[in-house]
Amino acid sequence: ILGGEGNIFLNFTEQLKATSYQWFSVYGQGMINLAPSGTGVNVLLLSLLENLSKNPFIANFVLVFSLHYFPFLGMYLVAREINLRPLSAFLVALFYLINPSISQYLNNLNQWNASVVALMPFLFWITLRFYKDNLKLFFFYGATTAIFSFAYTNQPLGVIANLSSLISLYIISFHVNKKMVYSEFLKKYVIILSAFILFNFWWLLNLF
């Protein structure tokens, strides 16, 4: 699938082989692999599907389906967490998915860029759901960022995702306490930031 930027691999198994190391040895003189583009869960699963099915159509279908399904699911979970009725939550999630800005973005079929629109609502939902349980907040927030590590491949979008988490935490903290308790807000931020660093240490090292 040639999506946005026109350099998306068609063969996920070959991509996994080419980008699983800290050094790209096949691109001219070589370059440092600064992001987990070949070692994320997405490529591992797509490569597995490709090898099990022996049919590239299945892996590509799963890719396109997941690019559109996960943003919808993330926003639906957020809407249900704030006690919207199922139909209202469905409509909110559907609008999030099909509004012109998001739909045009997803139509590029660039999973590394487009996945950030799924990551942000998932992190909002996890922060809201486990706000009062520090251990679960730490674990599920960190695990989700690791699973979606490929969404941080585009570094400016990675910054946007982390800023979104900070803003989400501010909103949730105010919502839970009915006022802004800055000491608690800072404590929660340290928890999610620590979770992000610890669970993603395996690829963050390449940035330094």
Predicted regions and their residues:
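Membrane-embedded helix bundles of polyisoprenyl
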Residues: 69-82, 86-176, 188-208
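Juxtamembrane loop-transmembrane helix junctions in multi-pass integral membrane proteins
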Residues: 54-58, 84, 150, 184
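Amphipathic alpha-helical interaction segments
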Residues: 31-32, 174, 178
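Extracytoplasmic
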Residues: 18, 133, 179
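Membrane-interface coil-to-helix junctions
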Residues: 1-72, 94-118
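Intrinsic disorder/low-structure terminal segments
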Residues: 8-11, 129, 184
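Membrane-interfacial, low-structure loops and terminal tails that flank and connect transmembrane helices
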Residues: 178-185
